[in-house]
Amino acid sequence: MKRSEYLVRRRRARVAVMMLFALIMGFVSAAPPVVTGCQAQDLTPVPDTSVLSPAISVPVQAEPAAPVLPEKWVCLTFDDGPSKTTPDVLNALNAAGVHATFFVVATGHNEKYLPLLTEAVSAGHQIALHSASHEYSDIYRSSEAYWADIALLKERIAPYVDAESIRYLRFPGGSTNTVSRRYGGKGLMKQLKAEVEQKGWQWVDWNVCAEDAVGGHPSADTIYRNVVRETGQQTNCIVLMHDSATTRTTAEALPDIIRWYADQGFAFLTVAEALPIG
């Protein structure tokens, strides 16, 4: 073979090899990259921003803040009304611009005074449950007897207030009374308190007692001094008083009681304001 032919063939072979190499490299560069250690489901797709709507800022709904109570507060509460005493109590409260809480009864003997509940609500006072009969031997026979009494109370006051919305109550004799043991046994009050809480209601005791229903018809001055003495150094007070037919002097003492608490820097709250439910 002549030298010239040899050189031509060698040049052609070199060109073929170069073309093949270029073809291989082009194929490799066009192949998708392989990401070591990731599966397709592990990769986060990149959105096509050209078709996305502008971002919308959605405000975060904050939990409602719990009400902040004054450092010193007092709840004036009245049991066993309404009665002929209630108008005088309402007059004293309204004159002072003070709201109170009434734990009411509906015994069948005070029916003509029940319309006063509407007046009390209109003036901004709170109505709460006490008892229909206030007969310990009846209401504390059993849990069923107690709740039957409450149902009767709600039925009797329903024409005058929104009875179904009431979620506060006071046990006759208080939550730690021992008289209930005679009729329903030692564990009855514990059971009743648990049942009240299961309903999402609130039972309410007191830490200041006016001692206006202990018998002997205490004078207005005695009732006033009882309240001042029992308040002592306490800064959060729930005062037990009565607006029953036999506690007329409570209404007489009320202006001085209100004035004394105001002078001591107490804010006047209803029970619902001081002990909010949920």
Per-range role (PLM):
Residues 1-75, 91-100, 159, 207, ...:
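Terminal accessory/targeting
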Residues 47-171, 274-277:
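Active-site beta->alpha N-cap acidic-glycine motif
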Residues 134-240, 244-262, 266, 273-274:
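Catalytic domains of cell-wall/extracellular-matrix polysaccharide-remodeling enzymes
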